[in-house]
Amino acid sequence: MASSIRRGRGAWTRLLSLLLLAAWEVGSGQLRYSVPEEAKHGTFVGRIAQDLGLELEELVPRLFRVASKRHGDLLEVNLQNGILFVNSRIDREELCGRSAECSIHVEVIVDRPLQVFHVEVEVKDINDNPPIFPMTVKTIRFPESRLLDSRFPLEGASDADIGVNALLSYKLSSSEFFFLDIQANDELSESLSLVLGKSLDREETAEVNLLLVATDGGKPELTGTVQILIKVLDVNDNEPTFAQSVYKVKLLENTANGTLVVKLNASDADEGPNSEIVYSLGSDVSSTIQTKFTIDPISGEIRTKGKLDYEEAKSYEIQVTATDKGTPSMSGHCKISLKLVDINDNTPEVSITSLSLPISENASLGTVIALITVSDRDSGTNGHVTCSLTPHVPFKLVSTFKNYYSLVLDSALDRESVSAYELVVTARDGGSPSLWATTSVSIEVADVNDNAPAFAQPEYTVFVKENNPPGCHIFTVSAWDADAQENALVSYSLVERRVGERALSSYVSVHAESGKVYALQPLDHEEVELLQFQVSARDAGVPPLGSNVTLQVFVLDENDNAPALLAPRAGTAAGAVSELVPWSVGAGHVVAKVRAVDADSGYNAWLSYELQLGTGSARIPFRVGLYTGEISTTRALDEADSPRHRLLVLVKDHGEPALTATATVLVSLVESGQAPKASSRAWVGAAGSEATLVDVNVYLIIAICAVSSLLVLTVLLYTALRCSVPPTEGARAPGKPTLVCSSAVGSWSYSQQRRQRVCSGEDPPKTDLMAFSPSLSQGPDSAEEKQLSESEYVGKPRQPNPDWRYSASLRAGMHSSVHLEEAGILRAGPGGPDQQWPTVSSATPEPEAGEVSPPVGAGVNSNSWTFKYGPGNPKQSGPGELPDKFIIPGSPAIISIRQEPTNSQIDKSDFITFGKKEETKKKKKKKKGNKTQEKKEKGNSTTDNSDQ
């Protein structure tokens, strides 16, 4: 029967093969599907009937079927809807092993007419196989004498999956002695080595337990572990020692034969044969003890050998020796003190049959934790056992049946208060005296994320000095979470916000694990004085809980900014300034005021002023206010004083170390009548670079220079002509010749008494532009000059000719220039013209006398430049007002630059002629003079100009 069946199957197979070969020409096709491995039964693969172009109604009549030689039962077709589905479990690793490609090939056959279709179903790999090590525990023996960097090769894990799912990475648990070294042999394999990083000492560390974890690259990741046990070998240098020298044991007198009296446990710090201990009774033990007790040489257990009788002996003293197997061997000793109890009872027995541990801290009341069974071999009252539990615990015992108890939860748990309970269950019988037995139940409370991370205080104040190095550690925040494990794993982050126009994260960062706060860039006190932000602490629980703490970072100022001198007016540099002071001023006259600012704060911005006196400057008649910066005269000036003074003012802050700046004030002493109503001030930098007159119109300067040059040439020519003509009587007072000093802008007359002081002084600053009308004699025709005394020539300048006018280009230049009064440079008041330099401070009246010690945070008003010619502080013109008169530096004449109405009378006396009209008349009368005298006068004029 079986033979016929096998023959029938063989015939059917051959017939099927012939039909397939015959139908190959009739019709064929190929479809390709994909399905993941481990797909459940009924998983959709594809609409095979639709893809083959077959109608659902003809599937059954045409005998639609699926044939496969090797995997016929894995896939099946639903003839009702023509869907190819998974029929049974598909395991890619079982089908194809580690092959990169895995497919199931089936043939679909239909009759009427006969057609064969080839269908290929690709099985896609999923990460269903974790990495597997050859063994779960690997033991390695290391002698304590092994050198550092000693290597021990390890065998890696294998993963049955392919591709990324089989890409493994390794991680070794932290250890102070060993680390893992991974070297790639080729693209597919890696060699692992355990490297000794710290010397071993077996007496301190006998064993080292490591855990090697292999993780694949799939999602989700699967891991495999191997425990590595490293044993440290040693020599026999330690003797066996018992836990205690005397063991006290009590036994019932009816103890059965073979009852364990005590189990000795001697320890030897050595390893291997050196730590193997053999136990034996002492050599001086009596024969009685040897007949009643026996000791196991390996385990150290002492058991009863014969019947014990309380009436025969109440106690026994047993000497025990422990000897190791080292060479040479070493021994240790102890004594067992055995006392017999004269009680003829059996103690109850307690057993725990089931446990449900650990228990969650949010478990509901009444949760059953353990089932406890008690028993007693006695009968009657002596066998009736009751159980009790350790008091004051959140558990209770509930009796269910006789001798059966349930340990249930009686009150709420809080793992943060108590993380584990060690319960003692006591079983007591009803005998007299009663006997009892106890057992311990360890209950661990599982954590629930019910506590948010907490900071020690809600706000911290941090002080950081400015100019810190980038990335420096400024503070550490620390939050504590009362939960455990992942629920207590706290991570830190910044609560992002904007600080001005920048993000907070551009200033500081916080380490997610340690909570260390770092400054990402140097902080600048002048930019940010207080940086207030929040740090968030969040645990890793589900759902996560978090809290915030506020950090106030105060940026402390450092003395990193030197005092900066303020320019006298906008557009000029700060450094040196020239001042003209009349000889007639008295003590306390304010010459100038030095103003400076310091970008720092506190003592670092508190500025003081002092004069730097050189050699020979003991009689200098000037002083500077310590905190006001006002330069004033200390006494009345006399002829013994030098006509030129170069004052070097040192501006110093109070930082550590102190920073300084210097200002140079050039003071020229002139006659009272010749002192200009407003002095021309030009500033240069501390390095002595030339300052530019940026506030005076360029065209005006060019015009004045051109006119002045023409005037110089005219005066020189006129002087030569005058010297060649014999002077007439009455033109000069006898015995008092007048010296004419020429400059680039004109000439002026001084008496013989003052000519040496003025003409032979130091060179004036190049930016001083002076124009004086010539005070020369006009000959006998001028009756007015004949009546003037010498002092009048010196003290009174000539009035300009009333018919002098500006050229058209010069007037256009003046109208298009910046108004000087609008810039605060020139102003007129009741006390005469004052010169005020623009400052950044508020316009507050200056103190008239005395010095006031500024506060620690001295402001700009006390540290900026202010210069004024004389006392008084007249009101300044308002912005946009055009000054009535313009003062040419160095000239007592005033040029009007205001637009006058057409119907108004122009006062021609307000204009300077520079003697041009007068000289034109005299050119017509000029004669040839002595050439030698002309050269001599030119030489004197040049010398005088250079001295000025």
Swiss-Prot record:
Disulfide bonds: none
Main localization (coarse): membrane
Domain Cadherin residues, every copy: 30-133, 157-242, 243-350, 351-455, 456-565, 588-678
UniProt xrefs under PROSITE patterns: CADHERIN_1, CADHERIN_2
Stretches for region 5 X 4 AA repeats of P-X-X-P: 734-892
Each PXXP repeat, start to end: 734-737, 797-800, 830-833, 871-874, 889-892
Transmembrane segments: 698-718
Entry's Gene Ontology cellular component terms: endoplasmic reticulum; nucleus; plasma membrane
Stretches assigned to the Extracellular side: 23-697
Glycosylation sites: N257, N265, N362, N548
Pfam family, one: Cadherin_2
UniProt feature, compositional bias: Basic and acidic residues: 783-795, 907-921
Keywords: Calcium, Cell adhesion, Cell membrane, Glycoprotein, Membrane, Repeat, Signal, Transmembrane, Transmembrane helix
SMART domains in the cross-refs: CA
Main function: Potential calcium-dependent cell-adhesion protein. May be involved in the establishment and maintenance of specific neuronal connections in the brain.
PANTHER family (alphabetical): CADHERIN-87A (PTHR24028), PROTOCADHERIN ALPHA-2 (PTHR24028:SF60)
Protein name: Protocadherin alpha-2
Species in which this protein is naturally found: Homo sapiens
Gene symbol of the encoding locus: PCDHA2
